[in-house]
């Protein structure tokens, strides 16, 4: 009886672990393409002008994000992306600070497993 080759086992584990990671890497990449200073400015402008609460501001952010995503990648890739998001709950989420009644978006967490993209990290 032969023992399993440790290299093969490690490779199998790596392949299994990489699949969702590669999709998350794609999510970060797409989010960085979509989230710009202009995008953040528009969200913050909406928050101030319409005096949105956090739930409304998050909804506004996601609607704008999805519209830009659909425009950027086309419907086929968009459908795969949103299907993955629904399954794993990995929609990008805005991070707000409350300044005495008005919200400011200071960053985005692309998924629950990925790092935050801060407003000041974006190219103007």
UniProtKB/Swiss-Prot annotation:
Keywords: Host mitochondrion, Host-virus interaction, Inhibition of host innate immune response by virus, Inhibition of host interferon signaling pathway by virus, Inhibition of host IRF3 by virus, Inhibition of host IRF7 by virus, Inhibition of host RIG-I by virus, Inhibition of host RLR pathway by virus, Inhibition of host STAT2 by virus, Inhibition of host TBK1 by virus, Inhibition of host TLR pathway by virus, Interferon antiviral system evasion, Modulation of host cell apoptosis by virus, Viral immunoevasion. The keyword Lipoprotein does not apply. GO terms for biological process: symbiont-mediated perturbation of host apoptosis; symbiont-mediated suppression of host cytoplasmic pattern recognition receptor signaling pathway via inhibition of IRF3 activity; symbiont-mediated suppression of host cytoplasmic pattern recognition receptor signaling pathway via inhibition of IRF7 activity; symbiont-mediated suppression of host cytoplasmic pattern recognition receptor signaling pathway via inhibition of RIG-I activity; symbiont-mediated suppression of host cytoplasmic pattern recognition receptor signaling pathway via inhibition of TBK1 activity; symbiont-mediated suppression of host JAK-STAT cascade via inhibition of STAT2 activity; symbiont-mediated suppression of host toll-like receptor signaling pathway; symbiont-mediated suppression of host type I interferon-mediated signaling pathway. GO terms for cellular component: host cell mitochondrion. It is found in: Host mitochondrion. Pfam families: RSV_NS2. Coiled coil: none annotated. The keyword Glycosyltransferase does not apply. A motif (DLNP) lies at residues 121-124. Plays a major role in antagonizing the type I IFN-mediated antiviral response. Acts cooperatively with NS1 to repress activation and nuclear translocation of host IFN-regulatory factor IRF3. Interacts with the host cytoplasmic sensor of viral nucleic acids RIGI and prevents the interaction with its downstream partner MAVS. Together with NS2, participates in the proteasomal degradation of host STAT2, IRF3, IRF7, TBK1 and RIGI through a NS-degradasome involving CUL2 and Elongin-C. The degradasome requires an intact mitochondrial MAVS. Induces host SOCS1 expression. Monomer (instable). Homomultimer. Heteromultimer with NS1. Interacts with host RIGI (via N-terminus); this interaction prevents host signaling pathway involved in interferon production. Interacts with host MAP1B/microtubule-associated protein 1B. The DNLP motif has IFN suppressive functions like binding to host MAP1B. Belongs to the pneumovirus non-structural protein 2 family. This is Non-structural protein 2. It comes from Bovine respiratory syncytial virus (strain A51908). The gene is 1B.
């Amino acid at each position: 009886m032969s023992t399993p080759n440790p290299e093969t086992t490690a490779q199998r584990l790596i392949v299994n672990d990489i699949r969702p990671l590669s999709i998350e890497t794609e999510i970060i990449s797409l989010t960085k393409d979509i989230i710009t200073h202009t995008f953040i400015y528009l969200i913050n402008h909406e928050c101030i002008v319409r005096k949105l609460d956090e739930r409304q501001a998050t909804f506004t952010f996601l609607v704008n994000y999805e519209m830009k995503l659909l425009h950027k990648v086309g419907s086929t890739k968009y459908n795969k992306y949103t299907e993955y998001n629904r399954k794993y709950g990995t929609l990008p989420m805005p991070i707000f600070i409350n300044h005495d009644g008005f919200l400011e978006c200071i960053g985005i967490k692309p998924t629950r497993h990925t790092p935050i993209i801060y407003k000041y990290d974006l190219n103007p």
